[in-house]
């Protein structure tokens, strides 16, 4: 099984067509091609294409879902991303610490989904509960929010 089929990037209720395009570009850089969108807001495909650069071939491969459960049906490992601590004390792992585990699971042909939440508020607690792993990406404490298309998963 190829890396592009094993790893699924899931964006929930995306509001920016530019973020979809930029995410496709980052995915292609990392060898991923499986993007799933759950209830995206109105999509401007010209903007998606413009920001995807040389990853425009992935636009036709985007899968659309009405629910997270539907998108996760074939997932064996679900990684939820978050930039903030929650009132519910979920154990978190940094991307650096988690990478060897994910690479090991990929070598075992496991299907992995990586969840990214809404641009304005991230993932809900219910969505986080559907994950096996809660991942944080270390940033400057003064401004801990990353644009999802700037995250390099490797």
Task: Label each region the model flagged.
Residues 34-40:
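Short internal beta-strands
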Residues 12-13, 38, 82, 135-142:
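Short beta->alpha connector loops at strand-helix junctions that form conserved
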Residues 118, 126, 133-149:
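Short, acidic/small-residue loops that bind anionic groups at enzyme active sites
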Residues 20-29:
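Histidine-anchored nucleotide/phosphate-binding helix
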């Amino acid at each position: 099984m190829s890396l592009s089929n094993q790893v699924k990037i899931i964006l929930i209720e995306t509001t920016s067509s530019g973020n979809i395009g930029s995410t496709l570009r980052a995915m292609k850089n990392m060898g991923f091609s499986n993007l799933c969108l759950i209830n995206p807001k109105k999509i401007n495909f010209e903007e998606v294409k413009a920001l995807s650069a040389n990853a425009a071939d992935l636009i036709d491969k985007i899968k659309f879902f009405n629910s997270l459960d539907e998108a996760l049906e074939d997932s064996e490992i679900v990684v939820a991303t978050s930039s903030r601590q929650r009132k519910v004390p979920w154990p978190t792992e940094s991307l650096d610490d988690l990478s060897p585990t994910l690479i090991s699971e990929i070598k075992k042909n496991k299907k992995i989904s990586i969840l990214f939440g809404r641009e304005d508020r991230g993932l809900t607690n219910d969505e986080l509960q559907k994950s096996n792993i809660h991942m944080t990406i270390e940033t400057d404490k003064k401004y801990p929010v990353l644009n999802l298309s700037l995250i390099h998963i490797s």
